Design a protein with these regions (language model features):
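Positively charged n-region of N-terminal signal peptides that target proteins for export
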Residues: 1-5
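Bacterial N-terminal signal peptides
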Residues: 7-14
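Sec/Tat signal peptide C-region and signal peptidase I cleavage site
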Residues: 15-20
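Subset of outer-membrane beta-barrel
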Residues: 21-337
Length: 337
């Protein structure tokens, strides 16, 4: 009985947090199209595939699972020549809590344009837009209700007493973003960007009422440089804010090349800190145009007791379809934000 009551309480905690904020990743730098639409197409290569999977709080029956896959490419090359970049992309995202009690599906299309500010393309100013379609469903069969408790324990076969087993809502959404980026002889790179989502404040109510989604603002920035001929250091941070939640993350990643001459393979290690919530160690491997990253959120928030101090496991994959480096509109350092 105690375990069932614990599961009931924690289910509603998770559901309230899931509806209070958008899906997000600890490896925000590995998911460009969810971070800022102005990043669309801004990389060295023909096309880019990126995917991230997140599994949070496994100790309480896996209430949070998020996955995304995205593709973007540089477009209209004959129109936007030299160092100016116009990119198009698409993204699909799936998010669920309480083993499917709340499910969210997102399908988004993005476009971004980055204009060089000097003759060498060392400084750029970009803007991006995102249009998406969102579908959300609540399945009452996945939750626990008081009518399902008996004197001898919990019986999931008993009816929930709810008039409907599922509720759902569908709506379009829009977002935009800006980005300033610069490089110095490809040895140093810096950037700062901002994105703004839920411009139209869509109505999320599943019962015919009004529950407008609060706009969300994201500010992100970073700086990286070559520590020596065989290594690089990356520093980045993020601030997200809406009417009902906020988040601050900062951290650093160290990259060590394994081959002095080609520098095609490397190992990466670092750590990030999410304010008042988690410490996030990171490890990664880069081989040619493929990169894999693994991180784990160590929970330090007020929920650490209920979650048994377990946080979120996250896996990111990225592959860039490369071409002749001499024909790239941007240097390879842009492949990491």
């Amino acid at each position: 009985m105690r375990d069932a009551l614990f599961a009931l309480l924690f289910s509603f905690i998770c559901l309230s947090q899931a509806t209070a904020q958008d899906p997000h990743f600890s490896q925000f730098y590995a998911s460009p199209l969810t971070l800022n639409p102005a990043l669309t197409g801004l990389f060295a290569g023909e096309g880019r595939i990126s995917s991230t999977y997140r599994n949070q709080w496994q100790s309480i029956s896996n209430p949070f699972t998020t996955g995304t896959v995205a593709f973007d490419t540089r477009a209209l090359r004959r129109v936007f020549k030299e160092q100016n970049v116009f990119g198009l992309g698409g993204m699909a995202l799936y998010d669920q809590s309480n083993n499917g009690g709340l499910r969210s599906r997102y399908l988004a299309f993005t476009a971004g344009y980055n204009q060089q500010l000097d003759k060498y393309g060392h400084h750029r100013l970009g803007i991006g837009f995102q249009a998406s379609f969102v579908s959300k469903t609540i399945d009452y069969n996945k939750f626990l209700f008081s009518r399902q408790f008996t004197p001898i324990g919990f019986d999931p076969s008993l009816p929930t007493g709810e008039p409907r087993s599922t509720l759902n809502v569908n709506y379009p959404d829009m977002g935009t973003g800006i980005l300033y980026s610069g490089i110095s002889n490809t040895e140093q790179q810096w950037y700062i960007g901002a994105s703004y989502y839920h411009i139209t404040r869509p109505n999320e109510s599943m019962t015919g009422g009004e529950a407008k989604l609060s706009p969300r603002t994201t500010i992100h920035a970073g700086y990286n440089f070559s520590a020596n001929e065989m290594s690089k250091l990356y520093f980045s941070g993020l601030y997200m804010n809406s009417a009902i939640s906020s988040e601050v993350m900062i951290g650093s990643i160290y990259q060590q090349y394994l081959n002095f001459y080609e520098k095609k393979s490397s190992v990466l290690a670092g750590v990030y800190y999410r304010h008042n919530e988690s410490i996030i160690p990171y490890a990664g491997l880069e081989s040619g145009d493929f990169q894999i990253g693994l991180s784990y959120d160590i929970n330090i928030s007020s929920l650490r007791t209920a979650s048994q101090s377990r946080g979120g496991f996250e896996l990111s994959l990225q592959y860039v379809f490369a071409k002749d480096p001499s024909k790239n509109a941007v240097p390879k350092c842009y492949n990491k934000f």
